[in-house]
Amino acid sequence: DLVGNTVKALNGQYRFQTMGEYRALLSLYNMTVEEARGNVRGREYHGLVYSVTDDKGNKVGNPFKSSLFGKSAGYEAVQKKFVRSKSEIKDRKLADMTKRTVLSVLQGTYDKDKFVSQLKEKGIDTVLRYTEEGRIYGATFIDHRTGCVLNGSRMGKELSANALQEHFTLPYAGQPPIPLSIPVDAADKAHGQTAYDSEDISGGMGLR
């Protein structure tokens, strides 16, 4: 079964520490997962239910109980996976490489689509979640180089959903960078006080 094989393969290859990070990983492969809780004959149980999704994340077809895919896809195994992933990521400092790459790309552009595509070229997929008003409320990075799924806020507040939302909606977001020959005060007038200091204007951030 394609869904089961994909779920098992992803569980073996990637590290994730929360259900949200697990869901972000699955979304790259048009799948999602939800927790199922209930009571059978007086005993409480926790389970996971997997679904196939369309490109907009809407569930299609019937859901699959995790028991169809074997123990590794079940609730208890995934909870253990969270704990194991946390210690591996911490002990081996696996988030550092991802953070460096994401920050370097972020500092190079205010264009969200360019940010996502440049990260993809470097081996990192970005999953952004939006409110109905179109604001970013969640950002997760899947680093295929290290096999880690990381919420932006886990790597620092400068990569949190709020910080990214602000970065991509600055007055000059989506605009070509200021020509480097413009003196600082002219640049300030052009944009209302920008957040640049003189070093940045002279090309310190290497914007393109």
How should these model regions be labeled?
Residues 1-208:
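Extended intrinsically disordered terminal tails
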